[in-house]
Amino acid sequence: MGLKWTDSREIGEALYDAYPDIDPKTVRFTDMHQWICALEDFDDDPQASNEKILEAILLVWLDEAE
């Protein structure tokens, strides 16, 4: 079962694991969207995201990075 846009915690943790040297505070949503869609376990419609979803994922990633 793949990751969906609603899995913000799991996606944020996966981004932290996949990009350990990236400071999430410097990431643009457009880049983050591409990285999420490229995650091996991601299995959802790339067009189904929105700013609120990306913000939730970013907050998890920031939390993991601290």
Swiss-Prot record:
GO terms for biological process: iron-sulfur cluster assembly. GO terms for cellular component: cytosol. Coiled coil: none annotated. It holds the Pfam family Fe-S_assembly. GO terms for molecular function: ferrous iron binding. Monomer. Belongs to the IscX family. May function as iron donor in the assembly of iron-sulfur clusters. NCBIfam families: iscX_yfhJ. PANTHER family: PROTEIN ISCX. This is Protein IscX. It comes from Escherichia coli O6:H1 (strain CFT073 / ATCC 700928 / UPEC).
